[in-house]
Amino acid sequence: MHLTYLGHSCFLVETGSARILIDPFLTGNPTAAMKAEDIRCDTILVSHGHEDHTGDAVAIAKRNDALIVANYELAEYFAAKGARTHGLNPGGAHAFPFGKVKLTLAHHSSSVEAGLNAVYLGSPCGILLQAGGKTLYHAGDTALFLDMQLIGRANLDAALLPIGDNYTMGPEDALVALDFLKPRLAVPMHYNTWPLIAQDGPAFARRANEAGHTVLPLKPGEKLEI
């Protein structure tokens, strides 16, 4: 399994012949490592309804004939815009040709803007992806919560965790999350996109590594093998 960080909370996962895009916010993202029109994928996983996660999902899905997997209400929203979708709910899993996707809890909100109103579209979620003999956890946007210990029972090869604070957990809580999840490797995300979520990724990694974890902050465009 290869993982490419595309900025904010967006990642491209390559496993076997599958190309899986997670939380595709590229257009309007000052840290984006690629343009939306250059993305090639066959599946898109979306954690929740906020624009900095749904971003280019429909446009990329239509261009690539890719399947969008998201919570049920969000999947229906994407389907109404002409995308192919598969809806899940937290705790539910489904086997796809590339592997299994399970949605987990996340403590956050999940809305899309509709003029002056926010329309809520189901529960925010984390994503467990099992493919190619590896297990990846994308936490989505979330606060720290005790049930992360249950997610850790999935024997995680990698965890992608927000550290930006303000809208999600910050570095202090992310360190506790690492204790709960016990991944072999963690990558911080959802930080330094805007001043309000500015954090020192290398400093977070040093503290985590000193505590016995393996954390690798990636720059947008960097790739690693899990």
What are these regions (language model features)?
Residues M1, E14-I20, A93-K102, Q130-L136, ...:
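Beta-strand-turn-beta hairpins that frame and shape the catalytic cleft
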Residues L67, A79-A93, L175, D179-I226:
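Binuclear metal-ion centers of metallo-dependent hydrolases, dominated by the metallo-beta-lactamase
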Residues L12-H50, G55-K62, E73, S109-Y120, ...:
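Pre-active-site segment of Zn-dependent metallo-hydrolases
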Residues M1-R19, L26-N29, K102, A203-A211, ...:
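Zn-dependent metallo-beta-lactamase
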Residues G55-E113, A118:
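Glycine/small-residue-rich loop that forms an oxyanion/phosphate-binding "nest" at active or ligand-binding sites
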Residues N29, H50-G55, A75-F78, G92-A95, ...:
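Active-site environment of divalent metal-dependent phosphoester hydrolases
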Residues L21-P24, C41-G49, V69-Y72, Y137-G140, ...:
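Active-site neighborhood of phospho(di)ester-bond hydrolases with catalytic His/Asp-centered motifs
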Residues E113-D179:
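Active-site-proximal loop/helix segments of hydrolase catalytic cores
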